């Protein structure tokens, strides 16, 4: 879409942060209003993360107004809230391409702009990186400042607290801004508290604070009295004791939608030494009533009509794999009160809403704490319960040691329901489920299953749930199932594949939901088609049978080729001295960028036409 100067006259003046800083302060509330309307106009046309950005408009304007970005370094955690940042940093006219193939990246991305200091997508990394950046800036000696913006969800993760604990120890000059967008604004946010925040961040208070500590440093009782008095004054209106104990100078909470007040507080804090912590209160979805009322639904949106206030309803076609999992979960829980389900802040995405309502005492959302989720599941298993960890492939990476040390070594029966396996689409490099087969396949005692359709998915979940000799995993993709009939649940024989079609010369060994395309290729080439079903243990007898009765083999998977299921097939053949030619089809050795699932599969040759072309070229 073209930028409408008449509709956004103040925003039209801002092509860069340098131009932003030339605006008089009095014009900034109008800029915020236009920026918020432009964000609504753009995202409703293009789709994308929405409610978080609406809540950070004033903060974004204030930060870029006070700090000399990009010389001063601004780090956004996760990046859902960074759309206004992109608009103000030279990407205004391209914001309509965000999350699209070849368009703006969905998150801050170092390769896209000098303003994007840290590439992000996963949560709770900003403070750790910010400490390193701040230490480097101190050694550089050019008075470069470092600011990290982190949300109230992301700050609950252990990594954020590890970083803050370290910052309190080495005391770098840096600012952490906590964007607290809980549903209700705290009672502490108001004129008195905003005034106190400006007072406590001001030079007079800061110099008195430090000077008093120096003067009375040799008099322990008075030093302690001063500390307690300061804490008492702050404690009357602020909840910052935890952050003070970690070594930060805590200011807040303040109104995150008062752009002029934020500018005053940030200017006061900019030159303070040591780690600083500014707590701001915002409203997710600010300025668009439907998003304010339902920020979860409006967190990420498809294209929609803003005037209607409603998102388009799904077509009501085939269920998603997440829905298949959620239905199976409820069905199984109704029969077995030992079932416990765990998610790290992915209730909606993992299809667990209905389960959480029907079985609240057996549902555990542990927040953004993947490591804890896995070891918590281990504890439940030790206690005689049957835990299921529902987690995205890309986030399971964050709990790898816990899978190894706390579950697999102890042979605990934990079922991992791995959603978003393979290509996920618009979220790009940081969210592709490209590696789970590779990083799980090497773990002893692990059973790994790859369903080819929703019925197999249910049977495999059932099989894994009833497997008691160690951990098991079922991986399934983002998107809709294929529409096969659902049959009664029964346990599958562990490590056994099935031949779906008999052909000649060539055998295609398929792992997972690329099966419909693999079937088309097998039909076209008159190839044998095998649904391998298990990545671990592999059906070695079936692999050797295919090698003995065919001239060449092809493996198909939506996982990195390196270390994936196809690599396992190669290992079996080499171990048995069967030098049969094998073509491994899967994800190549680079991070897959954004684009729709269909676009990326076509580009990578994972559709029927692409697979057939690869096979023909290889056989030629």
UniProtKB/Swiss-Prot annotation:
Q: Tell me the Gene Ontology biological-process terms attached to this UniProt entry.
A: 1-deoxy-D-xylulose 5-phosphate biosynthetic process; isopentenyl diphosphate biosynthetic process, methylerythritol 4-phosphate pathway; terpenoid biosynthetic process; thiamine biosynthetic process
Q: Which InterPro entries match?
A: Dxylulose-5-P_synthase (IPR005477), THDP-binding (IPR029061), Transketo_C/PFOR_II (IPR009014), Transketolase-like_Pyr-bd (IPR005475), Transketolase_BS (IPR020826), Transketolase_C (IPR033248), Transketolase_CS (IPR049557)
Q: Keywords on this record? A: Isoprene biosynthesis, Magnesium, Metal-binding, Thiamine biosynthesis, Thiamine pyrophosphate, Transferase
Q: Known Gene3D superfamilies for this protein?
A: 3.40.50.920, 3.40.50.970
Protein name (database record): 1-deoxy-D-xylulose-5-phosphate synthase
Provide the top EC class: transferase
Question: What's its job?
Answer: Catalyzes the acyloin condensation reaction between C atoms 2 and 3 of pyruvate and glyceraldehyde 3-phosphate to yield 1-deoxy-D-xylulose-5-phosphate (DXP).
Extract the CDD domains matched here. Answer: TPP_DXS, TPP_PYR_DXS_TK_like
**A Pfam entry, by short name:** DXP_synthase_N
- SUPFAM superfamilies according to UniProt: Thiamin diphosphate-binding fold (THDP-binding), TK C-terminal domain-like
For molecular function, the Gene Ontology terms on record are: 1-deoxy-D-xylulose-5-phosphate synthase activity; magnesium ion binding; thiamine pyrophosphate binding
Family, per entry? Belongs to the transketolase family. DXPS subfamily.
List the record's Gene Ontology CC terms alphabetically: cytosol
